[in-house]
A protein has these predicted regions:
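Short hydrophobic beta-strand element within catalytic cores of glycosyltransferases
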Residues: 298-301, 311
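A short helix/loop element that forms part of the nucleotide-sugar donor recognition site in Leloir-type
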Residues: 181-197
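Carbohydrate-associated surface elements
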Residues: 152, 174
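Aromatic "clamp/platform" in nucleotide-sugar-dependent glycosyltransferases that forms part
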Residues: 262, 281
Length: 381
């Protein structure tokens, strides 16, 4: 098959969906398929890996940028007559699309809980454009499959856009178990020493480029309220560090919070922790949850995140209702560190077992099956 993947940025230096697209391209090339990428930007060191078809966009405003990419990427995909066109994000006129970004219709309700504010924000050109793009894409008869990363997003796509059940597929993110594995725990002491963290203190790990939306404020409050007063927090990712350091200082836990920035060795940081915590306001499926579990780290997340699909409370982690559920986070932290060392080790083993059932190879195999289904339908039409 000649497959075109559509993604604004083809990169290993950006977010999870960008890295996932690179993995897809490489894996399908290994399977003997011809791969092209339709996008706006590509890392210089990836240029020789694939045929890259650049999309010229109007960047005058965010709304124009998103709309022009969706239209022009779709035009290129149709002109070249690929066997399969697959959008990882928002693009028009493709054979299949994968929901990797937050559904804007739902996100506005989560982000702006006040009804008046929400109504005003819906008139914002950027928000209005994204909602319109989603409506057109998910109701387009030429789009044969809509792929979601979790049960949460599957339900939301049906709720907001009435996508027929037969068009929907849920294909979970996979994890590279050669990179993320429990062996990283052997570096626990060394990593903690590098970061100035005592080898024996209970350590929570948080990883995100969106401190506010992923609940860092609530996490700090929960740590301050916890009866385990020695609990510390490792914050990975870039964001308004000074602002959140001030919040930690005001809560009296400033000396227990460590901002380590963006790390290329994030798997080693997982191995240094005791509990991964990411109570997102809304997220289709944060891959960091799966990465952490593959390294043996139990996960605390919110039921408003697709990542909740892989967490069994008390077995592989803990669930809280929302990003604002400080009391429930406090209770979860207390329960986790009330467990005996043996019980926490058992939980760690269960996490690894869960992640091993979701290797990246499963994702590739299921995606290939999807492409074969779509290609058969196109040939029969």
């Amino acid at each position: 098959m000649h497959i075109a993947f559509v993604k604004k940025r083809f990169s290993l230096q950006a977010g999870g969906s960008e890295r996932y697209t690179v993995t897809l391209a490489r894996q399908f090339q290994k399977l003997g398929h011809q791969v092209s990428v339709i996008g706006e930007r590509i890392d210089e060191d990836l240029i020789d890996e694939v045929e890259f078809l650049p999309v010229r966009t109007n960047r005058l405003t965010s709304a124009l940028h998103n709309r022009s990419f969706a239209i022009r990427a779709g035009q290129i995909a149709r002109e070249r007559k690929f066997d399969i066109t697959y959008g990882i994000g928002r693009s028009f006129g493709l054979d299949a699309v994968r929901v990797t970004e937050r559904l804007q219709s739902h996100w506005l309700g989560v982000r702006y809980r006040n009804g008046v504010t929400r109504s005003i924000q819906r008139m914002n050109p950027r928000h209005r454009t994204l909602i319109e793009l989603e409506r057109v894409i998910y109701n387009d008869d030429s789009v044969r499959r809509v792929v979601t990363q979790s049960r949460l997003d599957r339900d939301l796509v049906r709720k907001y856009y009435n996508v027929p059940e037969e068009k929907l597929r849920t294909i979970y993110n996979g994890v590279d178990t050669t990179l993320f594995h429990p062996g990283v725990q052997t570096e626990r002491k060394a990593v903690r020493e590098e970061l100035g963290i005592s080898p024996d203190v209970p350590l929570l790990v948080f990883a995100s480029m969106d401190f506010e939306g992923k609940g860092l404020r609530s996490i700090l409050e929960a740590i301050a309220n916890s009866k385990h007063h020695e609990t510390e927090l490792l914050v990975l990712g870039t964001g308004p560090v000074r602002k959140f350091q001030r919040i930690a200082d005001q809560l009296g836990i400033g000396n227990r919070v460590h901002f380590a920035g963006r790390r290329s060795d994030i798997q080693r940081c997982y191995g240094a922790g005791d509990l991964f915590i990411l109570p997102t306001a809304y997220e289709p499926f944060p891959n960091v949850n799966l990465e952490a579990m593959a390294c043996g780290l139990p996960v605390m997340t919110s039921t408003t995140s697709g990542g909740a699909d892989i967490v069994t409370p008390g077995k592989t982690g803990w669930l809280v209702p929302t990003v604002h559920s400080v009391d429930e986070m406090t209770e979860g932290i207390n329960m986790h560190f009330d467990l005996s060392t043996n019980d926490r080790e058992t939980m760690s083993v269960r996490c690894v077992e869960t992640a091993r059932q979701m290797p990246i190879e499963n994702n590739i195999r299921q995606t290939l099956q999807l492409f074969e289904e779509v290609l058969d339908e196109k040939r029969a039409a």
